[in-house]
Amino acid sequence: IKTGMLATVAIIERVADELAAHSTGVPLVVDPVMISKSGYELLDPDAVATLRTRLLPQATVITPNLHEAGHLLKSTVRTEADMRDAARALHDMGPEAVLVKGGHLAATDDAVDILFDGTTFHAVRAPRIDTPHTHGTGCTYASAIAAHLAHGRPLPEAVQHAKAYVTGAIDAALAIGSGHGPTNHFFHCTPFTESVAASADAA
């Protein structure tokens, strides 16, 4: 099971109640979507508090980015050392594991994420890809983790597979329109033989 943006206290409470009643033993990936790419806060403070107390403790793993981790902790996460501290503090809120995503780290050659299971830290690295077309990367990453957990893979292995998948999807991202284009979820299935722009011109 994977959750994404849950906008209100009522929605979070209903999801938490249903999960508690029906999902015993099923891995739960919580992607705590709460801040837009432009920095706009999508959840009010009461909803964030409910997310902390009702949903995080049920999670197999939570997958905040730097901004979301900072928002949950009411702090700032800027460095890899900060990510490790944040992962430990978030783990204290009850999830089995925490994956702090470092895609927004400044001036790094690789994209590093920190996975913490309460005992061991794992640094999950991939080459940083210079592209503006990263719309949906966090959702894709969390969903891929959930898919690999559903296949029975241990969490560290599931995260490694998901990281490789989302990196490939970013590398093959689609330049659609004039804004941030989406990742290409099907890059490994049906390679495009011509550019999206050329296809659009032909149409």
Per-range role (PLM):
Residues 2-57:
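Glycine/small-residue-rich loop that forms an oxyanion/phosphate-binding "nest" at active or ligand-binding sites
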Residues 2-3, 29-37, 63-72, 100, ...:
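Short beta-strands and strand-loop turn motifs
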Residues 10, 14-21, 27, 112-115, ...:
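Nucleotide and nucleotide-moiety/phosphate-recognizing core
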Residues 45-121:
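Conserved phosphate/ATP/ADP-binding segment of small-molecule kinases
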Residues 71, 132-155:
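Short, small-residue alpha-helix embedded
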Residues 75-83, 150-160:
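Short, charged, surface-exposed loops that flank catalytic or proteolytic processing sites
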Residues 121-135:
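Short pre-catalytic strand/loop immediately N-terminal to key active-site residues, enriched for Gly-Thr
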Residues 156-203:
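Charged C-terminal helix
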